[in-house]
Amino acid sequence: MSLSPASGTAGRTNWPAEILPVLEHTLTCEYASLTRTGAPITWPVAPYVAEDGRTVDVSTGLTYPSKAERARRDPRVALLYSDPTGSPVSGPPTVLVQGLATVRDADLQANTDLYLRRTLAKYPRSFARQPWFLVRRQVWYLARIWIEVTPLRVLWWPDGRLDVPPLRWEATPEVTAPPSDPVPAGAGAPKWLEPPADWRPRADHAAGLGDPVLTVVGEDGWPLPLRSSGATRVDDGFLVRIGPPGVLARGRACLTFHTHGADMSGQENVVLVGEATPLSDGVHVRVERALADFSLSGSRAGQVRKMVRTARALAPRLEREAARRGQPVPVPRRPR
């Protein structure tokens, strides 16, 4: 297939033109990174195309930096754009980007300014009902670490048809990513949220959140997140229906269920990890545990109460993480 140079926001690249609207307008993507032991972990995040059009970027909070620290240790990451909820793009392809991550946390104030600017542009209702003095109090959430992903390989399924082989694009051999900012000094804060003791109630609940994303590690060592066409709950996990190239998925696995409103007024996540084995009728995922997650669902009042509780838990970590990077705590500033 012959591809013409991309245009628009990502015009300085030769990414396939048909994927650009998806990269620019999809509200959430599934971001996959690798643990110290090489197991994949996948979470829904907000994606952005960089202003210079050379990377696709996601972020994580300074107070919960695990997504960034995994990428700093092993820059092989993947972004799957498979949920069109709230997107203005009609009949979008499902897009998988595999690339090298560059972690940016050497300028926390600039990171926070950029996050606010991008968030208000892409999600204008994010702070629409809040006076700015309340927004400023959310610095525990708004202080950001950026993860810039340089695409090396893109797979996409036109019209979201997951039952057919994907189209494929690869960067030229000289394309690489700049190094990440230095590892912060000292030890990071301990985990702030305990995972469920029993994964089964979370798995039962997840069955109502739509088709999950199954992530395994491909033969090339890259995380491979793929949207399934359905999952059936079984005693020890799930039987997942998956199209090519996931039919032979095996090894360490992550199942990510998530949903969000068209206006991003709420979101809910369930992430389960275990072991995948290919079968004749799908991929069997034996679940070992559920990960601790932060979801915002239910009434607006309930969401506010949860944010207040979370702020109390995470605020003490803010100064510690900023100090590890030799910087003051950033100040949320209204974009001009």
Question: What is the predicted function of each stretch?
Answer:
Residues S2-T13, S90-P201, R241-R336:
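Charged, gly/pro-rich active-site loop segments
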Residues R12-E24:
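Mobile-element integrase/transposase regions
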Residues I19-L20, A68, A203:
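Short amphipathic alpha-helical segments and helix-helix/interface helices
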Residues V22-L23, A71, T119, A206:
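A generic structural signal for nonpolar/aromatic side chains embedded in well-ordered alpha-helices
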Residues E24-T26, W140-R144, T150-P151, A207-D211, ...:
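Short gly/pro-enriched beta-turn/loop segments at secondary-structure junctions
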Residues H25, D74-V77, G208-L209, V247-H258:
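Short coil-to-beta transition motif at edge beta-strands of beta-rich domains
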Residues T26-T63, E69, A78-D83, V89-P93, ...:
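Short beta-strand segments
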Residues P182-P223, R227-S228:
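Surface-exposed interaction/gating patches
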